[in-house]
Each structure stands twice: as structure tokens, then as C-alpha cells.
UniProtKB/Swiss-Prot annotation:
<feature type="binding site">
    <location>
        <position position="117"/>
    </location>
    <ligand>
        <name>(6S)-5,6,7,8-tetrahydrofolate</name>
    </ligand>
</feature>
<keyword id="KW-0028">Amino-acid biosynthesis</keyword>
<comment type="similarity">
    <text>Belongs to the SHMT family.</text>
</comment>
<feature type="binding site">
    <location>
        <begin position="350"/>
        <end position="352"/>
    </location>
    <ligand>
        <name>(6S)-5,6,7,8-tetrahydrofolate</name>
    </ligand>
</feature>
<dbReference type="GO" id="GO:0004372">
    <property type="term" value="F:glycine hydroxymethyltransferase activity"/>
</dbReference>
<dbReference type="GO" id="GO:0005737">
    <property type="term" value="C:cytoplasm"/>
</dbReference>
<dbReference type="InterPro" id="IPR015424">
    <property type="entry name" value="PyrdxlP-dep_Trfase"/>
</dbReference>
<protein>
    <recommendedName>
        <fullName>Serine hydroxymethyltransferase</fullName>
        <ecNumber>2.1.2.1</ecNumber>
    </recommendedName>
</protein>
<dbReference type="Pfam" id="PF00464">
    <property type="entry name" value="SHMT"/>
</dbReference>
<keyword id="KW-0554">One-carbon metabolism</keyword>
<dbReference type="InterPro" id="IPR001085">
    <property type="entry name" value="Ser_HO-MeTrfase"/>
</dbReference>
<dbReference type="InterPro" id="IPR039429">
    <property type="entry name" value="SHMT-like_dom"/>
</dbReference>
<comment type="function">
    <text>Catalyzes the reversible interconversion of serine and glycine with tetrahydrofolate (THF) serving as the one-carbon carrier. Also exhibits THF-independent aldolase activity toward beta-hydroxyamino acids, producing glycine and aldehydes, via a retro-aldol mechanism.</text>
</comment>
<comment type="subunit">
    <text>Homodimer.</text>
</comment>
<dbReference type="InterPro" id="IPR019798">
    <property type="entry name" value="Ser_HO-MeTrfase_PLP_BS"/>
</dbReference>
<dbReference type="GO" id="GO:0035999">
    <property type="term" value="P:tetrahydrofolate interconversion"/>
</dbReference>
<keyword id="KW-0663">Pyridoxal phosphate</keyword>
Amino acid sequence: MSYIEKIDPELFEAIKNEADRQEHKLNLIASENYASRAVMEAQGSIMTNKYAEGYSGKRYYGGCDFVDVAENLAIARAKELFGAKYVNVQPHSGSGANMAVYFSVLQPGDTILSMDLSHGGHLSHGSPVSFSGKLYNIVPYGVSKETEALDYDELLKLAKECKPRMIVCGASAYPRVIDFKRFREIADEVGAYLLADIAHIAGLVVAGVHPSPVPYADFVTTTTHKTLRGPRGGMIISKTEELAIGVNKAVFPGIQGGPLMHIIAAKAVAFKEAMSEEFRQDQDQTVKNAKVLCSCLKQKGFDIVSGGTDNHLMLVNLNNMNITGKDAEAALSKAGIIANKNTVPFETRSPFVTSGVRLGTPSCTTRGMKEKEMELVADYIEAAIKNSENDALLSEINIKVRDLCLKFPVYE
């Protein structure tokens, strides 16, 4: 870091302040986590200097011997982790991975059946403001009004009506187990491709604490950060060699040029870390922590979407607390708790205001927090949201949160 301090003190100050924020604030953003020092070292390595258009053994540049080693390691480890045959580790992001899958088998105007963003889906699954919503005919599905969970019978009915070319399952704010086998059956009924986007739950999947879509989906996409605790990036698993060939062409030269070899090296490191028993235990603890936090909030009168959680996150509908998601996020931030406002199923407010907050336990679990700490966190959340305009009290909670964080440092 001394090089940055010497050359660019302004940026150094921002990085230093961000490090302080990460250490002393409690992060409950479900899509964030803390990468290991080894992962960050790989990201900052000399691999960043190398252009490597193409694929291992078939590059458009010379001097790729060692970046080939890095990419081959990442691919082999991903195959082992996920029990997959065909893997592409070059996508720069999860959205890019989804784009490559779409481009590999779909034509503009084809119908995609995917989860509505306001019900827990993702922008890249067909939101009107995303490329996916502009290029394809999107038919959204959502959760049941009664259970706030997926209704697979209704989903089958909708699939038969719209006859999609592709069905997308996976979400960014869905707290329940996804039945990938049932999705496969529905896709087969209508002759559709099945894409499973497991960006949020990939770590849980490789640890065996959430069912895997790999045996069922034609394509599986994921980010490599979030629960996988790797660098920011994407990955695609294809079911057959034929599909994999199409995906590889869609990634390069379809939507990308040179791969980010320093990021691919960091992916290799993260995949090796994810093979450890410690990682498996952390993923198991992540779910345990989410269940305890969820249960404590329910006992305090909070309305939990779908009544609970099976994974690393929960959605809190704040309508019964007479506060918006935006205001709750602001109050929590003043209390030292970082979360994000989120739409809830059958939302009536703007996405910039929302009626809910999304809470996740990956980051606090990586710090070493367990069930006992989640009970404390629930107390802090309750106090902050129920006293959202009491700045003095929010400052007191902030001190308690800071003290808690100091007991569980991110980086020793």
C-alpha cells in the first residue's frame, strides 16, 4: 500500500477509510463478503500485465504459458467443486455470464420465463432497464401471495401458456430453497433451456448446504464473490460439450476480448479455499446464523417474507413498522449496520424507496460471528428501526456495533 500512498495520497486515503469502514461496521448486505488475503494478493499480482485473448492452448498472443496454468487450475478446481464437466471462468461478471448464455442459444425476441425483479429476481433476468429486457420477450413469474414462496404448479401453467425458449431460475432476494429438479421437469414439459443463476448461493451449493442445479440445468451461472468469497467475476457451467462450445464462442469473441488473468488467478485461489472443511463449516454457519437472526426478528414483530429463510438471506417487510426501506437503511447505517433497502413481493413503493430491507449473514459469518452474536444483532436492528429518528440512540448503538466488530476483526 506504500506505493499508492506515495503516488496517489488522495486515493490512499479513500482506501484507508474503506478499510476502516469494513472493520468497524457490521455488514449485512447479502451479496457481499470478505475475500481472503490470498485472493487479494492474486488480484494484485503481475498476472494483470498479460493479455491472453482466446482459451488455454489456443491464444492469440504469445507468452501465455503461465497464465494458461492459472486458467487451467481455475477450471479444474471449479469442475471438482461443482461436479461439472464444462466450465468457462472468463466472464468478468455474473451479468456478463448470463449475457453469454443468452447469446449462445437465443435469438432477439425469443421468450424467457424468469423471476420478476420485485419478487426476488435479478436485473439481468429480464428487467426492462437491462439488456436482457430490451433484447428478449420477458414473461415474469413471481411468488404466491399466500406463501410468498414459489408455486411450481402455477409456474408450469405459465410456462405452458407462454412456451418460453428459456426458463431462468435463481434470484437475488429469495430466501427459500429452489427446487431445481422441479424446474427441470417444467422446462422439459415445454421444451425450454434451463438456466440456473446461483450467484448468491454458490458457496452454499459447493458446501452441500443447498441443493445443486448442476445435474439438472443446461447452464449454471454464478459470480465468484458473494458466498464463494472470491474475486469479483463470473463463471459458466454447461451441461454438454455442444452447449459449452456455444458458450465459449459467446464469451470470446462474442462479448469480451482479453480475459482478466489476475482475476482468473484469484478465482483459482478462491476455488482451492472453497474445497476446505473450514469453508464448508463457514457456509453451514452462514445458514445457521441467518435462521437465528430471522427467528429473533420474527419474535420482535418483524414481518419476514415467506415466514423464514433456508439460505443466507432474509427479506423484511417493514409495512407493519411504519417505515420505508429507504429510511430503515439510513437508520441502520447511523447505527453502524450496513444493509440495503429492497422491494418486497407485491411492492407498492418505488425501487428507490421500497417497503423492505434485505439482510444477509455471509460477511458477519466470515468474521467468525455465530448464533449468540446474531441475537445481539437482532436487538440492535430492532432498536435502530423502532427509533429511526433518535440520533442519540442510534449513536449509542453504533458504539456497541463497533465494539462487537472489534472482537471479530476482518483482517488480523
